[in-house]
Amino acid sequence: MGQKVNPIGLRLGINRNWSSRWFSVSQTTPSNILEDHKIRKFLKREMYYAGVSEFIIERAANKIRVTVVASRPGLIIGKKGVDIDKHKEALKKILHKEVFINIKEAKRPQANAQLAAENIATQLEKRVAFRRAMKKVMQAAMKAGAKGIKVKVSGRLAGAEMARTEWYMEGRVPLHTLRAKIDYGFAEAMTTYGIIGVKVWIFKGEVLHKGILPEKKEESKSGDKEVRSKSRRGRQ
């Protein structure tokens, strides 16, 4: 089950929080969900260059507060906040509601699963070899303090006629352990041969009520880091 389900949704209420944090009666819930979709779609398109990893939406009465978590917040704000004001006015015209936008800098962007997936997708679109792109992102995540990382790409890799799936894993990624803090990201690379899907799982430690458990040190005979990989061909 842990291999199939979204690891963030599986851990909601345990060590992860919702990205839409509001409550409404049943009559207004569908319209609120549609508004959240419009907000995320618009801001993702307008802020693609800033390395956005998450949009957190909160509601109070007829006001909407959006917190944007990005690796390069300065590009979103613009000179004297001009760019952010443009986004507010555009959303106000779309939703006919007052929208407040807060910018928050992403901590350790190299260990952020969504940013890592988008980084790999961008490299694939630039015709970088997929194995090189995967291993480069994995090394950066481990250096940034991740306990483990798993990367999977699916599609017509290297222009092959038959689609296949390949993945690499370094360290531990315990998807069945609910107290494990697992970050998950997904992105798509639009290549000349078709779409290549990229999935990234990053393990950041086990969480208890008192904090994060320290990682147990395991002595290795060889002393080298273990990197596992697997390839699987898809059906035509």
Swiss-Prot record:
Pfam families: KH_2, Ribosomal_S3_C. Residues 39-107 form the KH type-2 domain. GO terms for biological process: translation. Residues 214-229 have a biased composition (Basic and acidic residues). InterPro entries: KH_dom, KH_dom-like_a/b, KH_dom_type_2, KH_sf_prok-type, Ribosomal_S3_C_sf, Ribosomal_uS3_bac-typ, Ribosomal_uS3_C, Ribosomal_uS3_CS. It comes from the Bacteria. SMART domains: KH. Residues 214-236 are annotated as: Disordered. GO terms for cellular component: cytosolic small ribosomal subunit. Transmembrane segments: none annotated. Keywords: Ribonucleoprotein, Ribosomal protein, RNA-binding, rRNA-binding. One of its GO terms (molecular function) is rRNA binding. Part of the 30S ribosomal subunit. Forms a tight complex with proteins S10 and S14. Binds the lower part of the 30S subunit head. Binds mRNA in the 70S ribosome, positioning it for translation. HAMAP family: Ribosomal_uS3_B (MF_01309_B). Belongs to the universal ribosomal protein uS3 family. This is Small ribosomal subunit protein uS3. It comes from Helicobacter hepaticus (strain ATCC 51449 / 3B1). The lineage of its organism: Bacteria, Pseudomonadati, Campylobacterota, Epsilonproteobacteria, Campylobacterales. The gene is rpsC.
